[in-house]
Amino acid sequence: MGDPLQDRTRRLLTDYILFCARAPNTPEPLPTSVEAALLRSVTSQIQQEHQDLFNSFRDYQGNRLELVTQMADELLSNDQEFNWGRLVMLLAFVGTLMNQDRTVKRRRDQRNRLLLERDCYLIVSLLYNRLTGRHRSWLEAHGGWDGFCQFFKNPLPPGFWRRLLIRAILSCFFATAIFYIWKCL
């Protein structure tokens, strides 16, 4: 039998990201676990509360993996600042990027669908490695995915999410601007 934390982490990330990237008009698949259902619910609330901000990334045409890596570097930088809120904020952002295929032109649908599927698996792998590597001790100390479920039983005040979201988005914009300037030089 494998490592339960690794198994649950991979299953949760795969469930959530493929759920977000499903084709338009596709029925919503059932969540694969309690934590998957809760993650979908919490990220949906965050995306709705900050719809204008998240929608600005909905049609992102750049490299999704690079952008997620930058955002993960900002939000999951070290164990001292890592928390469930930062993780959920990152996953809400990832979910928004994965939803962007809904605006793709018909004649390029298949190519873009393949790129989206590739990005899904690369992003699952990136986040899985971060969570089960760098942040494994934090996850274990906070009860793993059972701790995640316990934490989100009682919702946090909107001010917490607003501050976290603003800091995350500003960091991402700053990182993207520096990356863009660096590429142009």
Curated annotation (Swiss-Prot):
It is found in: Mitochondrion; Nucleus membrane; Endoplasmic reticulum; Cytoplasm, Cytoskeleton, Spindle. GO terms for cellular component: cytosol; endoplasmic reticulum; membrane; mitochondria-associated endoplasmic reticulum membrane contact site; mitochondrial outer membrane; mitochondrion; nuclear membrane; spindle. This is Bcl-2-like protein 10. A motif (BH1) lies at residues 76-95. Its main location: mitochondrion. GO terms for molecular function: calcium ion binding; caspase binding; channel activity; identical protein binding. It holds the Pfam family Bcl-2. Its cofactor is Ca(2+). Interacts with BAX. Interacts with BCL2, BCL2L1/BCLX. Interacts with APAF1. Interacts with ITPR1, ITPR2 and ITPR3; the interaction with ITPR1 is increased in the presence of AHCLY1. Interacts with AHCYL1. Interacts with HIP1R (via ENTH and I/LWEQ domains). Interacts with CASP9. Interacts with BCL2L11/BIM. Interacts with BIK. Interacts with UBQLN4. Interacts with NME2/NM23-H2. Interacts with and PMAIP1/NOXA. Interacts with TPX2. Interacts with UBQLN1; in the cytoplasm. Interacts (via BH1 domain) with BECN1. A motif (BH2) lies at residues 138-149. Keywords: Apoptosis, Cytoplasm, Cytoskeleton, Endoplasmic reticulum, Membrane, Mitochondrion, Nucleus, Transmembrane, Transmembrane helix, Ubl conjugation. InterPro entries: Bcl-2-like_sf (IPR036834), Bcl-2_BH1-3 (IPR046371), Bcl-2_fam (IPR026298), Bcl2-like (IPR002475), Bcl2_BH2_motif_CS (IPR020726). Belongs to the Bcl-2 family. Promotes cell survival by suppressing apoptosis induced by BAX but not BAK. Increases binding of AHCYL1/IRBIT to ITPR1. Reduces ITPR1-mediated calcium release from the endoplasmic reticulum cooperatively with AHCYL1/IRBIT under normal cellular conditions. Under apoptotic stress conditions, dissociates from ITPR1 and is displaced from mitochondria-associated endoplasmic reticulum membranes, leading to increased Ca(2+) transfer to mitochondria which promotes apoptosis. Expressed in oligodendroglial lineage cells. The chain crosses the membrane at residues 160-182. Signal peptide: none annotated. GO terms for biological process: apoptotic process; extrinsic apoptotic signaling pathway in absence of ligand; intrinsic apoptotic signaling pathway; intrinsic apoptotic signaling pathway in response to DNA damage; microtubule organizing center organization; negative regulation of apoptotic process; negative regulation of extrinsic apoptotic signaling pathway in absence of ligand; negative regulation of intrinsic apoptotic signaling pathway. Monoubiquitinated by UBQLN1; results in stabilization of BCL2L10 protein abundance and in relocalization from mitochondria to cytoplasm.
